[in-house]
Amino acid sequence: MMLGPEGGEGYVVKLRGLPWSCSIEDVQNFLSDCTIHDGVAGVHFIYTREGRQSGEAFVELESEDDVKLALKKDRESMGHRYIEVFKSHRTEMDWVLKHSGPNSADSANDGFVRLRGLPFGCTKEEIVQFFSGLEIVPNGITLPVDPEGKITGEAFVQFASQELAEKALGKHKERIGHRYIEVFKSSQEEVRSYSDPPLKFMSVQRPGPYDRPGTARRYIGIVKQAGLDRMRSGAYSAGYGGYEEYSGLSDGYGFTTDLFGRDLSYCLSGMYDHRYGDSEFTVQSTTGHCVHMRGLPYKATENDIYNFFSPLNPVRVHIEIGPDGRVTGEADVEFATHEEAVAAMSKDRANMQHRYIELFLNSTTGASNGAYSSQVMQGMGVSAAQATYSGLESQSVSGCYGAGYSGQNSMGGYD
């Protein structure tokens, strides 16, 4: 094991902005002036929860001089991409590699995947046929429903083994009927999050399956925040309002899509009235650990957002849709823990394409595990002062995020 100047932290740099097709050889060529520790074994790509390259990598080097040479490569190009180079350390590298990728410590190996984009009228037989050759456990398909008891167009499928679930991910973007189906890694915990008791919902007329986006009859999945003073408590309430076990339900999903091909029924389930000072309606969170994004490019997709926060693994992304049926440039991103939400704040004012993104924290420490958080947060670039301001060292996490919305007096009020 190589020893560094800080008690075994080694000589590590992190690269960001790598092309998706980047290879170890490409990294070696980019850092040709540096000596990489253990050669090819010293390059560690970071993967998304779907098993794809995230565009980031850690590289172990031989000496402090090699680190200095690597840092001089910051903002130089690899192909058509310019690469950012940051100084890192072994603690950050080990933590990130452990908590990223499809086989991360954060991913329960229970054989679940999540489907999104199921077509109108999709039946249980079609889901089984979609995964033909992959064994699904008895009663292994869960169909979430919206507050009115209607199927949402998503499904959870549990396979007989984790290996089969990994194979199922290979069906991503294949078709059922005329619809491309997205397949994501999931867990039993995520399935359970859909079974929590629903809050009191606002009655809004649901459209028929062929209504166009932007019409007055569009179904808006907004909820009244029960027992909270708007958003000032800093904690969303959990639950999407029950789920329906696999029992042959095949009701109409009422899907429609926006200009970018996203399912409005899904996007709108995460929409809230964005007149922040006046509205009592907020998006529900399944975890209570949320980061709000502002300034997104209008063509930004959920994958863009997942990649933006990489190597962190958001639980869910809600892209906001305005009353006119168009994206607003804002989104809510849920994380599994308070520590991950705080770590995500290190990306505040970072760029997505040509836009810099503002982030606002809305999370509480109730479900956090702080034993490792201070070291990890600093490794992720979050200062102790920011962590304190964000609630890691404070018992009071109310008001700032909500106040920033209510009066728009704060551009970045963290909890």
From Swiss-Prot:
It is found in: Nucleus, Nucleoplasm. Residues 81-86, 179-184, 355-360 are annotated as: Interaction with RNA. The modification Phosphoserine is found at residues 104, 107, 161, 187, 193, 195, 265. GO terms for molecular function: single-stranded RNA binding. There is a cross-link at residues 87, 167, 185, 200, 224 (Glycyl lysine isopeptide (Lys-Gly) (interchain with G-Cter in SUMO2)). Component of the heterogeneous nuclear ribonucleoprotein (hnRNP) complexes which provide the substrate for the processing events that pre-mRNAs undergo before becoming functional, translatable mRNAs in the cytoplasm. Plays a role in the regulation of alternative splicing events. Binds G-rich sequences in pre-mRNAs and keeps target RNA in an unfolded state. It comes from Mus musculus. This is Heterogeneous nuclear ribonucleoprotein F. The record marks 16, 20, 52, 75, 116, 120, 150, 173, 294, 298, 326, 349 as: Interaction with RNA. Residues 11-90, 111-188, 289-366 form the RRM domain. InterPro entries: ESRP, Nucleotide-bd_a/b_plait_sf, RBD_domain_sf, RRM_dom, Znf_CHHC.
